[in-house]
């Protein structure tokens, strides 16, 4: 019995016996407040707090309610003390995240914290989320010689952009709802020139918080995400992308009047979400529109991508403001639709045969959130756009589908209607190399699943290797 007691391990010392480097890594996964609580355990744990490479300050976590009001004194004192200790000990800080969304902290105090992390601590990764009114951020932040990643948002107003600002180390920048003070006219080109090593850029704009004029030029940029929530302003007169090194593009905006100087020499993946304004499209009672302008140039510019994702609105823009669908000679994966319940099924099924016909190497087709059939009477709508006259019919592309390289078909939002079965019949009856069909059904019990599977299994298949999988849609 005594021997058994001696052999029993002491689990209470397991964590304490870990090396400091590993403990610091574990503490980095906690919020800074939670990590600070461990300092009461012993002097060793208190010293570890000064060695954590990641600091996460969030006033929504640290502020405590008292008599119906939030106290900001504790938050301010906590950040002041910890940053001061880190500067005194010259301990390395890799990443700092500062979230001030409750108000009550003076802007000058926040600026002091930011400059301390950049200037004195030499932080590599800085994330700022200041959301208690309009906050003015000085451009001294961009003079850092160590900063590699920077995220700025939301509702932060930047000071005047000086021409001598250069940050040679920054390679990732996020501008989330930012603005330049006093309406300064700052060209996108100036920002890109300030960061000669920039490889990743994310920009989010709204009808108020915006500054991009539609021109982007960079030799180093590899990833660009641009999203505009502005649906009230006029479209940009011209959009150009002089980005020969760009590999990934995620572009969401109103359709511009024109697109030119598009250099996508290295582009592999493109995601387009293009919106038409009321002035760009005038719908008639039969749902056919007459518009001016052309997005054909944009689609020609991305024709060499391997992965293409088009939202329902982008499909509408292509149909109403496009004149020709280019050949996508390298396209392997095509994703159409979105998780949002909108989009015209008429336009979708009008364009799909031509998209498939012009994507000879396509291996994976993903259809998301769109109605998978054309409503009764829509087939007879008279063509009144250049694109509608050029669209292939399913009968026309049947031969090209039979030689298609498509191996995977994935459909979400499937309901199992007879119209959907007719469309599935076209796929299964023509795609000779199809290997997997994944169908996601929203409301499905075991009985519904069996019925859907039974209907699909009865459809004729030209591919003997095709495996049909029916699954419940979780999202």
Curated annotation (Swiss-Prot):
Matching PROSITE patterns: FBOX
* Domain F-box stretches: 12-58
**Coiled coil regions, renumbered to chain:** none
Q: Which SMART domains match?
A: FBD, FBOX
Highest taxon of source: Eukaryota
Name the Pfam families for this protein: F-box (PF00646)
Q: Which species is this record about?
A: Arabidopsis thaliana (Mouse-ear cress)
- Enumerate the InterPro entries for this protein: F-box-like_dom_sf (IPR036047), F-box_AtFBL13-like (IPR053781), F-box_dom (IPR001810), FBD (IPR006566), FBL60-like (IPR055294)
Indicate what this protein is called per its UniProt record.
F-box protein At3g59150
């Amino acid at each position: 019995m005594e021997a058994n007691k001696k052999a029993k391990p002491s689990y209470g010392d397991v964590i304490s016996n870990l090396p400091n480097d590993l403990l610091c890594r574990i503490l980095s996964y906690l919020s800074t407040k939670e990590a600070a609580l461990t300092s009461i355990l012993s002097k060793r744990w208190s010293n570890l707090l000064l060695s954590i490479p990641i600091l996460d300050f969030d006033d929504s976590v640290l502020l405590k309610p008292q008599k119906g009001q939030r106290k900001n004194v504790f938050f301010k004192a906590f950040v002041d003390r910890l940053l001061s200790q880190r500067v005194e000990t010259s301990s390395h800080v890799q990443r700092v995240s500062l979230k001030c969304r409750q108000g009550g902290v003076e802007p000058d105090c926040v600026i002091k914290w930011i400059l301390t992390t950049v200037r004195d601590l030499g932080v590599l990764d800085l994330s700022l989320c200041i959301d208690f009114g309009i906050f003015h951020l000085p451009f001294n932040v961009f003079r850092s010689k160590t900063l590699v990643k920077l995220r700025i948002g939301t509702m932060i107003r930047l000071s005047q952009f000086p021409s001598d600002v250069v940050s040679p180390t920054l390679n990732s920048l996020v501008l989330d709802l930012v603005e330049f003070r006093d309406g300064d006219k700052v060209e996108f080109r100036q920002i890109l020139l300030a960061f000669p090593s920039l490889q990743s850029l994310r920009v989010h704009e709204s009808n108020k918080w915006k500054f991009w004029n539609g021109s982007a030029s960079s030799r180093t940029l590899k990833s660009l995400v641009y999203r505009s929530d502005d649906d009230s302003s006029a479209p940009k007169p011209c959009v150009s992308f002089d980005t020969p090194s760009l590999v990934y593009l995620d572009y969401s905006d109103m359709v511009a009047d024109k697109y030119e100087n598009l250099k996508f020499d290295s582009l592999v993946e493109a995601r387009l979400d293009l919106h038409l304004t009321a002035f760009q499209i005038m719908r008639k009672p039969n749902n056919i529109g007459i518009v001016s302008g052309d997005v054909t140039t944009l689609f020609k510019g991305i024709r060499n991508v391997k992965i293409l994702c088009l939202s329902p609105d982008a499909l509408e823009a292509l149909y109403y403001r496009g004149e020709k669908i280019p050949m996508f000679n390298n396209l392997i994966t095509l994703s159409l639709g979105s998780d949002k319940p909108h989009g015209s099924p008429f336009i979708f099924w009008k364009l799909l045969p031509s998209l498939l016909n012009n994507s000879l190497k396509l291996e994976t087709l993903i259809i998301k959130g769109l109605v998978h059939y054309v409503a009764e009477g829509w087939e007879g709508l008279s063509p009144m756009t250049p694109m509608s006259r050029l669209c292939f019919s399913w009968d026309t592309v049947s031969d090209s589908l039979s030689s298609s390289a498509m191996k995977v078909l994935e459909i979400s939002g499937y309901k199992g209607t007879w119209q959907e079965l007719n469309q599935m019949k076209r796929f299964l009856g023509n795609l000779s190399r199809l290997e997997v069909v994944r169908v996601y059904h929203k409301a499905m019990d075991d009985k519904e699943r069996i019925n859907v599977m039974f209907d699909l299994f009865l459809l004729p298949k030209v591919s003997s290797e095709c495996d049909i999988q029916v699954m419940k849609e979780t999202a």
